[in-house]
Amino acid sequence: MTDHVAVRGIVNGRVQGVFFRASMVREARRLGVAGWVQNLVDGRVGFTAQGPQDRVDALVAWSRRGPLGARVDDVEIISARVDPEQGTFEVR
């Protein structure tokens, strides 16, 4: 798993109540990326993603658009540690 990378992201905008989490799970699983996504109490969405660099980059690019009905104003991304226990992508 040495060629894998991990990131944490915070998505700002109209991202709750628009199926952002369910859509991100679907996209992450399609890409073969592991991690999780959750609603935050302040109205943002947080996520972690890990896998091959190109696939993680693709999911981050998707998060900047989001699903139909979402309005993404900003996405903050920071590097994270790969979690070898995280084998799938899920809603938390």
Q: What would you call each of these model-derived segments?
A:
Residues 1-92:
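Intrinsically disordered, low-complexity, mixed-charge
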